């Protein structure tokens, strides 16, 4: 994404491949998810999980977290050098839920990381299969995006909580590579940069010496990633200024916050991929599906089709609504936390409600929660239609970037208007257009003022029937223009705490 000449498709980023043709890409992505599936089956055998227990999303998440922890070299090294009480740096584990005498029991398991790595490599033809690990990270990130709010993190870096729609991928680990960078929202990149600049302000040695040089390279790389997400010349020029600053400080923080706000209307291009829980790939492999031979894509019909035929269960707390739990996981599976609810509802075929109206907490169960009253139910992850995932941000034509709602980052390439409250957004841009970026700021504000909420994004793009795998007959939905489609409207979700 960094420069025009080297655009690789998501799948190439995902599988670390150089330019490949469509068939090769489909095969390598297929190899990646097939490896995840084989690993999951092997882990279920190791843990002696019943078929039902193996389809429990909480068990899937524990197994995914174990393999991610086993390959987290930085943290493993840190744990070995700083032994903390009661933590064995060589072991990893988590809660596994089993059905005993009509009740759900929690069992804490511990495994050697070495053993987990062996099982993972064995499932992936002896390779480290980093792409598969990144894929699991993105699934966890998408789940966090749908489940938690980042108000506190936004406020801490001096940003406005209403900018939540820019925060896709904010919980992705740093080691998530190019595929991870592609799915990070503008706000996430801005926040990472601001944290870095603040450290530099507080710690004189941050930019100095041998370490400082590495820090500087990382800073410039992050600036370039963010620059690549912007689609207007003025926004990109401002990013050049931030990157080239000799000694990044408050002026750069100001510029970055300005750019983040501008992205509410002049949308950045952020990739969306449907990353599914490991148990879903496991089920498909177990039923004899050959991912590598059939090929697979994260941005087409394949994930929809997979979910159409998979039965996944979830633990449900006493007062939770199973339909709402299903919505949460459906949104996570399709990376649709920041999508317009009108579009999501149309594709899913059932109404998708704002988070403030959900009677459900997160998917993961804390270790201090009582298992006595825990129930389980089937997650409804099927959809009525499918649509192609987008990476464009939905500006109507590339140069004159158009409207974007104050809380939408489109996931699906489907025609719609992007309603937004221009007054709300423009109010944030009070006067401050002096300084070295003044001409760019003026230009950005001018573009924002000329954006019209009634403009149509993704002109002519529609959804497809699930029988239409070649995407031949687009069905262009018509939406009620007035209805605001923000998932975070009237939000009351928990904060994300690491």
From Swiss-Prot:
Disulfide bonds: none
Protein keywords: Capsid protein, Helical capsid protein, Host nucleus, Host-virus interaction, Ribonucleoprotein, RNA-binding, Viral nucleoprotein, Viral penetration into host nucleus, Virion, Virus entry into host cell
Main location: virion
GO biological process: symbiont entry into host cell; viral penetration into host nucleus
Pfam families from the UniProt entry: Flu_NP (PF00506)
Post-translational modification: Late in virus-infected cells, may be cleaved from a 56-kDa protein to a 53-kDa protein by a cellular caspase. This cleavage might be a marker for the onset of apoptosis in infected cells or have a specific function in virus host interaction.
Signal peptide: none
Motif Bipartite nuclear localization signal, residue range(s) on this chain: 198-216
GO molecular function terms attached to this record: RNA binding; structural molecule activity
InterPro entries in the cross-refs: Flu_NP
Motif placement: Unconventional nuclear localization signal: 1-18
Gene Ontology CC: one annotated term: helical viral capsid
Ranges where the record places region Disordered: 1-21
Subcellular location: Virion; Host nucleus
RNA-binding among keywords: yes
HAMAP family: INFV_NCAP
Family to which the UniProt record says this protein belongs: Belongs to the influenza viruses nucleoprotein family.
Subunit structure comment from the entry: Homomultimerizes to form the nucleocapsid. May bind host exportin-1/XPO1. Binds to viral genomic RNA. Protein-RNA contacts are mediated by a combination of electrostatic interactions between positively charged residues and the phosphate backbone and planar interactions between aromatic side chains and bases.
Record's function text: Encapsidates the negative strand viral RNA, protecting it from nucleases. The encapsidated genomic RNA is termed the ribonucleoprotein (RNP) and serves as template for transcription and replication. The RNP needs to be localized in the host nucleus to start an infectious cycle, but is too large to diffuse through the nuclear pore complex. NP comprises at least 2 nuclear localization signals that are responsible for the active RNP import into the nucleus through cellular importin alpha/beta pathway.
Name of the protein this chain belongs to: Nucleoprotein
Species per Swiss-Prot/TrEMBL record: Influenza A virus (strain A/Whale/Pacific ocean/19/1976 H1N3)
Gene transcribed to yield this protein: NP
């Amino acid at each position: 994404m960094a420069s025009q000449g080297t655009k690789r498709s998501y799948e190439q980023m995902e599988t670390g491949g150089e330019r490949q043709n469509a068939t090769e890409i489909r095969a390598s992505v297929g190899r990646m998810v097939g490896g995840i599936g084989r690993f999951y089956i092997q882990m279920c055998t190791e843990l002696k999980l019943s078929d039902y227990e193996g389809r429990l999303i909480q068990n899937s998440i524990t197994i995914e977290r174990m393999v991610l922890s086993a390959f987290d070299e930085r943290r493993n090294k840190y744990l070995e050098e700083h032994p903390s009480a009661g933590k064995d740096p060589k072991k990893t584990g988590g809660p596994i839920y089993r059905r005993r005498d009509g009740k759900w029991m929690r069992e804490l398991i511990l495994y050697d990381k070495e053993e987990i790595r062996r099982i993972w490599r064995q499932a992936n033809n002896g390779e480290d299969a980093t792409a598969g690990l990144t894929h699991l990270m993105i699934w966890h990130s998408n789940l966090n995006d749908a489940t938690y709010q980042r108000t506190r993190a936004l406020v801490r870096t001096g940003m406005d909580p209403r900018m939540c729609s820019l925060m896709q991928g904010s919980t992705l680990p740093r080691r998530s590579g190019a595929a991870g960078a592609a799915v990070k929202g503008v706000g996430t990149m801005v926040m990472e940069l601001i944290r870095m600049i603040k450290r530099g302000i507080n710690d004189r040695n941050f930019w100095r010496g041998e370490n400082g040089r590495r820090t500087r390279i990382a800073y410039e790389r992050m600036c370039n990633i963010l620059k690549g997400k912007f689609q207007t010349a003025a926004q990109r020029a401002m990013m050049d200024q931030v990157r080239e600053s000799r000694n990044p400080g408050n002026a750069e923080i100001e510029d970055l916050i300005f750019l983040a706000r501008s992205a509410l209307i002049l949308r950045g291009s952020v990739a969306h991929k449907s990353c599914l829980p490991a148990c879903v790939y496991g089920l498909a492999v177990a039923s004899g599906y050959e991912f590598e031979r059939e090929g697979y894509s994260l941005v087409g019909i394949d994930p929809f089709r997979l979910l159409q035929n998979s039965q996944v269960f979830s633990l449900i707390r006493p007062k939770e609504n199973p339909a709402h739990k299903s919505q949460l996981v459906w949104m996570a599976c399709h990376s649709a936390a920041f999508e317009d609810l009108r579009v999501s509802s149309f594709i899913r075929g059932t109404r998708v409600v704002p988070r403030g109206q959900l009677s459900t907490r997160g998917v993961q169960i804390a270790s201090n929660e009582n298992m006595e009253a825990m129930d389980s139910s089937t997650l409804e992850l099927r959809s009525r239609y499918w649509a192609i995932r987008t990476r464009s941000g939905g500006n109507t034509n590339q140069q004159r970037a158009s409207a974007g709602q104050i809380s939408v980052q489109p996931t699906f390439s489907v025609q719609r208007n992007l309603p937004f409250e221009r007054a709300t957004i423009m109010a944030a841009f009070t006067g401050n257009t002096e300084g070295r970026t003044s001409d760019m700021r003026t230009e950005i504000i001018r573009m924002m003022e000329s954006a019209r909420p009634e403009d149509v994004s993704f002109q002519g793009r529609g959804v497809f029937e699930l029988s239409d795998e070649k995407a031949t007959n687009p069905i262009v939905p018509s939406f009620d223009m007035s209805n605001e489609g923000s998932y975070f409207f009237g939000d009351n979700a928990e904060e994300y705490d690491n």
